UniProtKB/Swiss-Prot annotation:
Region (Disordered), start-end ranges: 1-21
EC number(s) reported in the record: 2.7.1.160
One example GO MF annotation: tRNA 2'-phosphotransferase activity
PANTHER family reported for this sequence: PUTATIVE PHOSPHOTRANSFERASE, TRNA 2'-PHOSPHOTRANSFERASE 1
Protein name (Swiss-Prot/TrEMBL): tRNA 2'-phosphotransferase 1
Family matches, as SUPFAM superfamilies: ADP-ribosylation
Pfam family, one: PTS_2-RNA
GO BP of this protein: tRNA splicing, via endonucleolytic cleavage and ligation
Catalyzed reactions per annotation: 2'-phospho-[ligated tRNA] + NAD(+) = mature tRNA + ADP-alpha-D-ribose 1'',2''-cyclic phosphate + nicotinamide
Keyword terms of this UniProt record: NAD, Transferase, tRNA processing
Annotated InterPro entries: Ptrans_KptA/Tpt1, RNA_2'-PTrans_C, RNA_2'-PTrans_N
Cell cycle in keyword set: no
Lineage: Eukaryota, Metazoa, Chordata, Craniata, Vertebrata
């Protein structure tokens, strides 16, 4: 089986207990594969993959099966995970597509060039109005992660599937072309999230903000300065 991202489609009708288990498994997978593998004694390869058999042998995952993992990966509408067989020994392995706080040197990211015809000239970062004063004055920070997450549009627009939470009530729009002209790098993740490490300090400065919107209760433009 070739490596492929399994995450299209929605979970069919199931009982609430199964749904709750799936949510719990999805959250646990996100933590382990993005942040906590080494803390839990699990070996993560340089490309971010962890072997499923080793994962399921861990105390936190012993109540789950390979079928559970496959179902959660397939039903994840944001395609957060990639599940495939290792090319050398066919052992099943899993990784998170983005969102890491641990350094993953061989993560499959595609760097964007201004020569690309399809790169988004403007991208959006989702946050919350309570953070707007600090964002407006200091910029966006990758904080403890390796990248700042952006989307090519708001959730539900076109083929936008990931990049910001549905609960966000603030949208900060980034002038991608201007930032790239100043040497800021941008990458596509496998599930369509636009990623940037920001500048040397991990910041995307306010000078790259093109506009901002309060999203709830109704979209409304807000002042940048």
């Amino acid at each position: 089986m070739d490596c492929e991202t399994r995450g299209r489609g929605r979970r069919g009708r199931g009982n609430r207990n199964e749904e709750s288990r799936d949510v719990r498994l999805s959250k646990s997978l996100s933590y382990v594969l993005r942040h906590g593998a080494s803390k839990m004694g699990l070996q993560m390869n340089s490309d971010g993959f962890v072997f499923v058999e080793e994962l399921l042998a861990h105390q936190q995952f012993r109540s789950f099966s390979v079928d559970d993992v496959e179902r959660v990966v397939a039903s994840n509408d944001k395609q957060r995970f990639k599940l495939c067989k290792h090319p050398e020994d066919d052992r099943l392995q899993i990784r998170a597509n983005q969102g890491h706080s641990v350094q993953v040197t061989d993560l499959e990211l595609r760097e964007i060039s201004q020569d690309d015809q399809d790169y988004p000239r403007e991208a959006v970062h989702g946050s919350y109005m309570k953070h707007w004063p600090s964002i407006r004055s200091q910029g966006l920070s990758r904080m403890n992660r390796t990248h700042i997450h952006l989307a090519p549009g708001l959730p539900g627009e076109g083929r936008v599937i990931s990049g910001m939470r549905q609960s966000c009530d603030l949208a900060v729009y980034i002038d991608v072309t201007k930032a790239m002209s100043d040497g800021i790098k941008f990458f596509w993740s496998e599930n369509g999230v636009l990623l940037t490490p920001g500048d040397a300090a991990g910041i995307l400065a306010p000078c790259y903000f093109s506009r901002a919107q309060r999203l709830k209760p109704l979209p409304c433009d807000i002042e940048l300065h």
